[in-house]
C-alpha cells in the first residue's frame, strides 16, 4: 500500500489530556509506524506535551472559550474552534493531504471547507453525542463517518438517521501491560501483603458513580474483608466523595491518590486484585476500562453506554448502574480466588490485544477510510 499524507486536526490534542486527545495521538503514532506522513494539528501546547515519535506537530493560537460571551456552551465551543481554524485552516488546505480527520463535531465546518478546497477526504471520528442543529446536514457531506462504539453509532442514527461505521478507541498495549507488584507504591499507600486492593482510575465527576464503589467496599469491610480501595484521579466530586467515605466509616479503607499520571497507571494496577468502574452516565466507549484490562486486571463495570463492548466474557463482569450491592457481590467472589482473577486478567489482556491495540486500530482505520484499497 502506498503511503498517504494525513492530517489529524483537534485543538485540544496539544493542550489537555483525555479520551479524544489519547485517540488522536495514538492513531497518529500508529499511522506513522505504518509508513504514512502524519501531521498533528493542535492549539499552542501546554507545558509537558510530548510529540509522538515520527509525527510532525503543528500548533496555532486560539481564543479560549471562556473569553467569549456566555451564549451557551455550544456557542462558546464553536467560537473557540473557529478562532483556531482562523489560524490553522490555511495550512490545512495547503498541506496537500489525502485525508483529514477531526474528532469533534464543532470542527466539521473547518474540515468540510478544507476538504472542498484541497480535495482531501473528510473523515469524522465521533467520540460522543454533542449534537446541535445542522449536525445531520454536516455529517452527510463527509467522505467517511466513524464512531468509537456501536452504541455511539446507534445514538447518532437515532438523532439524524445517519449511522457511522465503528472504529473503537485504541490502547497502548506496550505501556499498559501486566507488571510485578510495585512494593514502593504499596508502601506509599500503606497497603499490606494480605490486603486485597481494588482500583478506580477516572476523573471524579458524578457520572463516574464512584460513590457506589465506596458503598461496595464498606459492605465488604463490614464483613471482615481486608480490602482497600484506591481512587486515582481528581475532579469536582472529590470533596463530596471524601465526606461520603467518612460518613460510612471507611476512613483508612478508601484512599484518594489525587491526580495520577496516565503513563504511571500500570504501576498502580500492579497492586490491584480488581478494577471497579461504576459509571452511571453516558459513556461512549470506556478507555480507562480497556487500559485496566490491558494491564491484566479483571474489571467490574456497569452495563451502560458502550461499556459492554469493552468488557469481554471471561475478563470482567457487568452489573446494573447505581448498585453498590451488586459490585460487592462480584468482589466477594473474586477477592479470595487469585487463580480465577489470574485467568480473567489473561482473558482481558488477550481481548484488548486482539481488538484495541493501536496496530489493529491503525489497520482498521486504513480499511474503513479507503486507504487500504
Sequence positions of predicted segments:
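Short alpha-helical donor nucleotide-sugar binding micro-motif in glycosyltransferases
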Residues: 259-260, 267-272
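A conserved mid-protein helix/loop that constitutes part of the nucleotide-sugar donor-binding site
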Residues: 22, 26, 196-219, 225, ...
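Nucleotide-activated donor-binding/catalytic signature segment of Leloir-type glycosyltransferases, i.e.
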Residues: 242-260
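Carbohydrate-associated surface elements
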Residues: 151, 170
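Short His-centered aromatic/hydrophobic patch
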Residues: 80-84, 102-107, 126
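Conserved acidic donor-binding segment of nucleotide-sugar-dependent glycosyltransferases
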Residues: 313, 317-324, 333-339
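Acidic donor-binding loop of glycosyltransferase active sites
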Residues: 270-284, 297
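A short helix/loop element that forms part of the nucleotide-sugar donor recognition site in Leloir-type
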Residues: 177-191
Amino acid at each position: 500500500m502506498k503511503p498517504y499524507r494525513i492530517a489529524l486536526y483537534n485543538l485540544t490534542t496539544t493542550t489537555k489530556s483525555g479520551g479524544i486527545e489519547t485517540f488522536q495521538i495514538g492513531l497518529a503514532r500508529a499511522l506513522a509506524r505504518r509508513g504514512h506522513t502524519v501531521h498533528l494539528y493542535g492549539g499552542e501546547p501546554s507545558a509537558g506535551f510530548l510529540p509522538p515519535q515520527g509525527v510532525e506537530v503543528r500548533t496555532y493560537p486560539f481564543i479560549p472559550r471562556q473569553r467569549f460571551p456566555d451564549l451557551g456552551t455550544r456557542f462558546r465551543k464553536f467560537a473557540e474552534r473557529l478562532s483556531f481554524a482562523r489560524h490553522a485552516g490555511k495550512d490545512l488546505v495547503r498541506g496537500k493531504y489525502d485525508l483529514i480527520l477531526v474528532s469533534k463535531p464543532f470542527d466539521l465546518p473547518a474540515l468540510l471547507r478544507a476538504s472542498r478546497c484541497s480535495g482531501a477526504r473528510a473523515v469524522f471520528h465521533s467520540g460522543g453525542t454533542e449534537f446541535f442543529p445542522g449536525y445531520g446536514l454536516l455529517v452527510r457531506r463527509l467522505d467517511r463517518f466513524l464512531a468509537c462504539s456501536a452504541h455511539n453509532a446507534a445514538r447518532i442514527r437515532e438523532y439524524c438517521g445517519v449511522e457511522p461505521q465503528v472504529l473503537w478507541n485504541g490502547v497502548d498495549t506496550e505501556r499498559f501491560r501486566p507488571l510485578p507488584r510495585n512494593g514502593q507504591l504499596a508502601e506509599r499507600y500503606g497497603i499490606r501483603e494480605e490486603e486485597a486492593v481494588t482500583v478506580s482510575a477516572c476523573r471524579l465527576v458524578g457520572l463516574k458513580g464512584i460513590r457506589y464503589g465506596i458503598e461496595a467496599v464498606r459492605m465488604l469491610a463490614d464483613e471482615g474483608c481486608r480490602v482497600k480501595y484506591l481512587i486515582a484521579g481528581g475532579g469536582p466530586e472529590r470533596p463530596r466523595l471524601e465526606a461520603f467515605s467518612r460518613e460510612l466509616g471507611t476512613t483508612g479503607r478508601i484512599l484518594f491518590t489525587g491526580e495520577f499520571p496516565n503513563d504511571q497507571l500500570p504501576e498502580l494496577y500492579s497492586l490491584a486484585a480488581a478494577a471497579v468502574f461504576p459509571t452511571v452516565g453516558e459513556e461512549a466507549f470506556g478507555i480507562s476500562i480497556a487500559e485496566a484490562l490491558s494491564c491484566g486486571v479483571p474489571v467490574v463495570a456497569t452495563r451502560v453506554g458502550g461499556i459492554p463492548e469493552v468488557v469481554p466474557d471471561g475478563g470482567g463482569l457487568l452489573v446494573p448502574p447505581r448498585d453498590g450491592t451488586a459490585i460487592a457481590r462480584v468482589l466477594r467472589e473474586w477477592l479470595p480466588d487469585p487463580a480465577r482473577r489470574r485467568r480473567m486478567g489473561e482473558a482481558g489482556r488477550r481481548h484488548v490485544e486482539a481488538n484495541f491495540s493501536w496496530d489493529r486500530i491503525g489497520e482498521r482505520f486504513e480499511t474503513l477510510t479507503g486507504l487500504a484499497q
